[in-house]
Amino acid sequence: MYKRQVQREGITVSSTYIRTLVEAGDMERAADFLGHRHCLSQTVQHGQRIGRTIGIPTVNLAVPEHVLAPAHGVYVTEVFLPDGRRCAGVTNVGTRPTVSDSDRVSVETYLLGFEGDLYGQELRVEFCRRLRGEQRFDTLEALRQEIQRNIQQAEAYFEA
C-alpha cells in the first residue's frame, strides 16, 4: 500500500518533523502542523510550595520519560480543569534552576484567576506559545518579577 506524503510549505509533514518543533519549543508551528496544540495530561502532585511563598502558587506535574515535553522554558498555556473549566496559564518546563540543583524535569503552571486545590486531579495543559527559555535568577524576588511579566504576556495573548 502506498501512502501519499503530505507537503506543506515545501516540508513533508511527519511525526519526526512535528516532534522536532515541540522539542525546539516552536509550539505555534507544531500546532499548525498537528491541527491542534501539543498537550500534557497528568495528575497534580505536591511540590515544594515555593511559588506559594512568593505569591504565585503553581500546580506541579511530573513528566514521565516516555512523554514528549517541549523545550525547557516558559510558555503561555491553556489548562483544562477536571470540572470542565479552562484557565489561562503560565507554565515552566524544566529543572527550576533558581530553586533546585536537580536535573529532574518538571512542569509547573500558574493558573490565572484560579483559587483552589487540585492535588490528585488530572489536568490537561495545552502549550500555546513559548515566551522565553528557562533562566536561573539570583533571587526569588527577581524570579517573581519575571513571572509577573510572563503573566502579563499570557493575559495579552488571550485578550488578542
Question: Which role does the model predict for each range below?
Answer:
Residues G47-A160:
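Phosphate/ribose-recognition catalytic cores of enzymes acting on nucleotide-derived substrates
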